[in-house]
Amino acid sequence: MRTNLTDLSCRHLKKLLHNEDACTSFLYTLKWPKGFVCPRCQHQQACTIATRRLPLYECRACHYQASLTVGTVMEGSRTPLQKWFTALWHLSRPHCSLNAVQLSAIIQVTYKTAWSMLHKIRTAISRADNARPLHGDVRGLLAFYGYHPISPFKERQHPVIVAHSITPNGSTSALKMKMTRLARPDHKILSYVEHQAFINTHVAASSMEPTINRYFYRIKRKDRLYQSSKQVWRWLNETFHGIGSKYLQLYLDEYCFRYNISYMYNSASELFCQFCRPLFTSSSISIPKLKRCA
């Protein structure tokens, strides 16, 4: 197998992952590039248990049984690896947005299975996003998803803090969007408590003092960050036909992730390999019904 997995082209990747055995071998090489290492005792020899759909590797020293998918978004799933890899490859491309209907058609699974796969991936992305605070010169503002100046349906307007890190040359190096609460929604003002909560949670302590506009009606509509939020709203509406408050944060995190990966990864294949590793862990996602679907 090719040694440098992060330099794979799309064509080579499809050729490499042509069946389940090839996908299993690929995942093994990603997990243990220099050969098996027991995650419990670091012993380097194992016997293979091949009676399951995916093999287990039992350490010859401590008898711990290691799985290839543990800690990844594929953990606990009955969906074939080849279908998972196809989904992850599409999501690894920065400008390729998929909804469940489109994914179900691409990998030939039910809508329910496609939705649960995407949900597990988005949940992992969201946790990864929460673990990466903004650094440096951080600026932000209060925006509203679903806002319309003359709309009577205030409950459909979801307040979101939109913030980004600014590089010395003025460009955006990282974007973050987090839902928030307003003490008095009609006033469209972010409270000091919520303002500080965002900073404490999502801005690195080593950063400069963040500048966040707490007053929605004082925002200039030509502001670059405000225009970025409008692009996100269009993406949500055009790709997913609108998102309710229950899952909105996951989709906001996905958009920010897509925006930020251009600074984090050199290629789609590098990101694809990262998707397959436990860094994007889903082991603590407690969704029994979804695990049965995916």
Label every PLM stretch briefly.
Residues 1-294:
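Residue-level recognition of single "structural anchor" positions
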